[in-house]
Amino acid sequence: NIDYDVISDEDLHYEGLAAIEDYSVVVSSTHPEYHSVEMWDAMDAYQRRGGRLMYLGANGWYWRIQYHSEVPGVIEVRRNEDGIRTWEARTGEYYFSFSGEYGGLWRRNGRAPQKLLGVGFTAQGFDISSYYKRNPDSHKAKVKFIFDGIGRDEKIGDFGLIGNGAAGLELDRADRALGTPPDAYVVASSVEHTDIYLVVCEEMLVSTPGVGGHENELVRADITFHETQNGGAVWSTGSIAWAGSLAHNNYKNNVSRMTKNVLKRFINPKPF
């Protein structure tokens, strides 16, 4: 019984911070892949003023886009140089025709998603989903609220509508080198992905064996928590499939429990 409003990508682009500044908590969709600079800056400003973000997905804040200044609903994306993509911009077409700015991955624009979210795109696969195991960080005092009612050795999300697990389709991981805050807690990570799950191409300089889920430690989803300025915070699940596990057993499960734990705590203005 928590009141909510739905804000679209266009709302965030055209209204900026004003679209979300009055909310104590913003909850993302499961696959917020495309963001303009206006959208990115709005979320960054929201966090800096003490807003709290629950990122319930993966492959988010990935491609930089541009909206047409006169035609509503029209966006431009340039799939430059790198990243998982189904088509590629031709040489000389890396800049937006709408604005003249460079397109492509936000990571190549100096803004890896880890800087904003704690996690960023790392792997994808489309056979079955998996589950999470708790990490040592999960037992630290500041983040114990996340696991209220969840056992020390419970498998988190070994069920669900999307591949029978909460960690699946596309996965995000923490990486300090890419901007995950040094004080971020990596409280849980997914395990036992198949070799259908492969590391994304921007992580590789040359093609090599061992990029599948059975061998490569980059094939995982991380659940992270970090604080931002003025009492703000970010909690990220690292998986598109997370939402598919919420309704399992009439919402009586540890994925739903954890999500509710975080939402209730984020609504509470008390400092962490």
Predicted regions located by residue number:
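Catalytic or ion-translocation cores adjacent to nucleophile or general acid/base/metal-coordination motifs
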Residues: 45-105
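Mid-to-C-terminal "cap/lid" subdomains and adjacent gly/pro-rich loops that border
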Residues: 81-156
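Extracellular ligand-binding/catalytic regions of CAZymes and related secreted enzymes
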Residues: 62-78, 126, 131-272
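Helical hinge/lid and interdomain linker segments adjacent to catalytic or ligand-binding clefts
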Residues: 1-69, 246
